[in-house]
Amino acid sequence: DKDAGHETQVCVCHFNSNEMKPEQILLDVHTHTIASGHAFSSLQEMVHAAAEKGLQILGITEHAPGIPGTCSPIYFRNLHVVPRKMYGVELLLGAELNILDYEGHIDLEEFYWKMLDIRIAGIHSLCYQNGTIEQNTSAMLGAIRHPYVQIISHPGDGTADLLFEPIVLAAKETGTLLEINNSSLNPVRHKVKAHDNNLEILRLCKQYEVPVILGSDAHISFSIAQYDHIYPLLQEVDFPDTLILNDKPEQFKRLLKPLPA
């Protein structure tokens, strides 16, 4: 939290398409394997693809039980059997948790949260009853303030209408990272609000100097570290390169919200 020194202070320079190239991307921490039920690559295939793309860190964040067809909780309990470095890539094994209600409660249980290397959370229509913009914002703020939630996935995808300024300010205060999600911006997803929502998030993060994490949300190995739908938005708002963490693995690890004592 702010008092513990987690409020982020970052110097600002501006995004330039010539400064950050795909080969400079060193981490992607929102991906899924076949364990999520509707993805198409194995864990080893995902890590191998990450190594081929030159990544230093890969996060594999399987869907939590609120999503039909995903793995059962025992999957997360057994993550200890997986090496945390493969093909030269550091692995962060975790979950994409589901925001369940207007208070920001998430699924799984604390017993499992503690076993994860990384914890992201988002709103998914399959397990969230859409409310008013105030109710949805309350849900998101509750998740941002949750001590175990480190990253908010696809806040701009339009699944729920949100007030973004309080969300960005809460992220800054708590050290919770906001994701700009490439998959949400893919035209084949037909998420009509995603473009404008993500532009607003980026403008607010620029205004308040809040770092963001780009997420591929890859459900197949070919999509790892694929941010092609995000780059035009970064250029449109002249987003500061120093606030993008995907080419800064050590800074990312420093800024990742620590677990409760």
Question: Where do the PLM segments sit?
Answer:
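Active-site mouth loops of central-metabolism enzymes
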Residues: 29-43, 98, 124-132
